[in-house]
Amino acid sequence: MTTAARPTFEPARGGRGKGEGDLSQLSKQYSSRDLPSHTKIKYRQTTQDAPEEVRNRDFRRELEERERAAAREKNRDRPTREHTTSSSVSKKPRLDQIPAANLDADDPLTDEEDEDEDFEEESDDDDTAALLAELEKIKKERAEEQARKEQEQKAEEERIRMENILSGNPLLNLTGPSQPQANFKVKRRWDDDVVFKNCAKGVDDQKKDKRFVNDTLRSEFHKKFMEKYIK
């Protein structure tokens, strides 16, 4: 990491350094990084494959010793595996493997152990087939139950939707036997009773009862005055 950005608390002053008596000479400063380093050559030690050691070594003999050691290590594990293999093989020999001279009249002609093993294998196969069949049956029942539940849910949703449609329409509610009779009244417009309505010509020509109108132009007095003095 560079140290160029560090502030200089002791600036260089020419002629005042060590061994500088002449002010006209330039100041001399040296960094510790400028000093010579690694001034001695490093040599290989006794255990670092020096040239003398390499010349005196017999690589062929070392290789042969390593191969013999590996062979001994491999043969050490072999008796254990051979013992395991021999124990697994040490079963009663089959009938076809026994020579005819060694057969006894009392010996059975069939191998009972083989028959027992075959029977056990067949029984295991039967049990496995039965379990698989039972599993398939359970899966099928669950699928049918799921389909039935989905169908019932769809039917219930459809029924609720139809009820909402029928109950939301007042005209359809009248047809139902249990729906109460509703009286429909036409609402009056918000501008039915306003004063300035139907101001077109000829609308007020019809005979109407005299009534007070809060409008000087449509009042009876104004109409009579206009008919008498203006027309």
From Swiss-Prot:
Residue list for modification Phosphothreonine: 47, 110
Residue positions where Phosphoserine is found in the record: 123
Locations listed in the record: Nucleus
N-acetylthreonine: residues bearing it: 2
Compositionally biased residues, Polar residues: 24-34
Sequence segments annotated as region (Disordered): 1-132
Biological processes annotated in GO: mRNA cis splicing, via spliceosome; mRNA splicing, via spliceosome
Feature: compositional bias, Basic and acidic residues: 52-84
InterPro entries: Cwf_Cwc_15 (IPR006973)
Domain of life according to the entry: Eukaryota
GO molecular function: RNA binding
Coiled-coil annotated spans: 125-167
Pfam families: Cwf_Cwc_15
One GO cellular component, as annotated: U2-type catalytic step 2 spliceosome
Family that this chain belongs to: Belongs to the CWC15 family.
Protein's job: Involved in pre-mRNA splicing as component of the spliceosome. Component of the PRP19-CDC5L complex that forms an integral part of the spliceosome and is required for activating pre-mRNA splicing. As a component of the minor spliceosome, involved in the splicing of U12-type introns in pre-mRNAs.
Designated name of the protein: Spliceosome-associated protein CWC15 homolog
The species this protein was found in: Bos taurus (Bovine)
Encoding gene (name): CWC15
